[in-house]
Design a protein with these regions (language model features):
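Alpha-helical transmembrane segments and their helix-helix packing motifs
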Residues: 2-348
Length: 348
């Protein structure tokens, strides 16, 4: 008796698929966000040590956490921002909170994921929960961030090597690319307008150091140097982060992979509700492809990036409406809502 390998023949029942789809996408988003946040904290600590003044405030701005942060802190200092974003259990955007949310999604996915994937997430989460104030001092933060990034990259490697390639993996990869696109636009938006009024001027030692920090925050410094050696003009850096087809964290690259994953959900698994989402992603890609970097900057970089972020939020909303389970009955327990950068996930 032969076993069918047709992906359509192995579809899960719709409610089960919906739950797994949601958890797969948010697991990827949370782990990607943890790695991005650890990298930005690490780069900021190095950059501020060299004399920058607004680096810690920029982290709060990138994550759109001004209201939450300044409700309990009068100023964005190193100690306060690091504690807020690493160990603050009351902050849903802290690395520890994100890791706990990721583990809960992995728990729901336990029938689908490997023992290695589950064990590594558990070990990582327990490590973060054990952190104390002395572990996150500015003098220790670089080493800590390196450990966090390494754990996230280990998760990515285990997932790549063990996660079965079906709808769940497509939702996982779509979530990772959606998060990358959102994070890169936030980074460019805040950093570009923070760094433009540099008194020392374009091309100065301070200016070069600042734009180097932007590239390092996006894990793109060495890739950029390969193709743009010696050119650290703001427009060149922005162009690379937006439009490089070869840099995996660029906006254009993230949107291409996002489109591929959602398109496969429609074509390979006959999920017809993906059609409108594919069209929105195509609309978003066209908005990027139809303009040069110079045109985007001249017409308004902030306005363009704000438009991209709104389109990305609409993509997430439409995915949820198309594939997530319907709301629970009123008699059911209230879900715990995790709010991240203007987007939410309801966790039972």
């Amino acid at each position: 008796m032969s076993m069918s390998l047709d992906p359509v023949a192995t579809l899960s029942p719709h409610p089960l698929l919906s739950r797994y789809a949601e958890c797969s996408m948010w697991l990827a988003r949370y782990m990607e966000r943890i790695e991005n946040l650890a990298r930005i904290i690490d780069v900021t600590e190095t950059f501020v040590r060299s004399g920058a003044s607004d680096g810690w405030r920029a982290i709060v701005q990138i994550n759109a956490d001004e209201e939450r942060f300044y409700a309990s802190h009068s100023k964005a200092t190193a100690d306060r921002v690091i504690a807020f974003y690493v160990i603050d259990a009351e902050n849903p955007t802290s690395i520890t909170s994100l890791a706990l949310a990721a583990r809960e999604n992995a728990r729901a996915l336990r029938p689908l994921i490997s023992t290695e994937m589950w064990s590594q997430l558990n070990i990582f989460t327990q490590f973060l929960r054990g952190l104390r104030a002395e572990d996150i001092r500015p003098s220790e933060i670089s080493q800590l961030c390196a450990r966090i990034k390494q754990e996230c990259q280990t998760h990515t490697g285990i997932t790549e090597g063990t996660f079965y390639r079906d709808q769940a993996s497509l939702f996982y990869n779509a979530g990772r690319q959606l998060e990358r696109a959102d994070q890169i636009t936030r980074l460019i938006d805040i950093k570009y307008h923070t760094l433009l009024p540099v008194a020392a001027g374009v091309g100065s030692e301070v200016d070069i150091s600042q734009w180097t920090s932007v590239l390092r925050s996006a894990a793109g410094y060495h890739a950029y140097r390969r193709v743009m050696a010696g050119d650290l003009r703001p427009s060149s850096v922005v162009g690379f982060l937006l439009k490089s087809e070869a840099f995996p964290r660029s906006l254009v690259c993230s949107l291409r992979h996002l489109h591929n994953n959602v398109s496969r959900l429609r074509s390979d698994y006959r999920l017809r509700d993906a059609g409108g989402i594919v069209e929105r992603i195509e609309f978003l890609r066209a908005g990027l492809d139809d303009q040069t970097v110079g045109q985007i900057i001249t017409r308004g970089l902030h306005e363009f990036l704000d438009w991209v972020q709104r389109q990305l939020q609409d993509v997430q909303t439409e995915v949820a409406q198309a594939f997530w389970p319907p709301p629970r009955p009123v008699s059911a327990p209230d879900p715990v809502t995790i709010e991240m950068s203007g987007q939410t996930q309801s966790q039972s």
